[in-house]
Amino acid sequence: MNDELPDVQAGFRQGRRTRGQIANISWIIGKSKEFQKNIYFCFIDYTKAFDCAHHTKMWKILKEMGIPDHLTCLLRNVYAGQGATVRTGHGTTDQFQIGKGVCQGSILSPCLFNLYSEYIIGNAGLDEAQAGINIAGRNINNLRCAEDIMFTAESEEEIMSLLMKVKKESEKVGLKLI
């Protein structure tokens, strides 16, 4: 699954950390000063991102991203029939079904969420977007660390355009921006 993710996604990937993304932001700022370009940043986060990934949408996304059917089937079996109860001071509730969210503590969950996030970014068209900052022949308009996304562009209008595209695609798969 690691091959499916671009360099701009550092979340839960071997050899990549938040510190690296901070260094990238610092590099972008330095290059924008060097080339005398305006630079704008917008940092976004999702409300309960890992809890809101819909299972049925997740299976569809995995299929569309070319994840082999046998792997998706295994994942579906892991998530099938999940239930929970809540214990309070007055007793325990009846069991209820869980139809969204990735399994807390599972080593697969970050990978699944990264693919979910990649689907959103791809459908928002950020890979092809002209918005961003062009440094050394490369257009950079976002950096990601799991569910946290940073947009960068040369104008407020470009930032708003990127934000609105991602907001729209996120809502289609059940995620809301904070």
What function would you assign to each model-found segment?
Residues 1-178:
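Nucleotidyl polymerases of mobile genetic elements and RNA viruses
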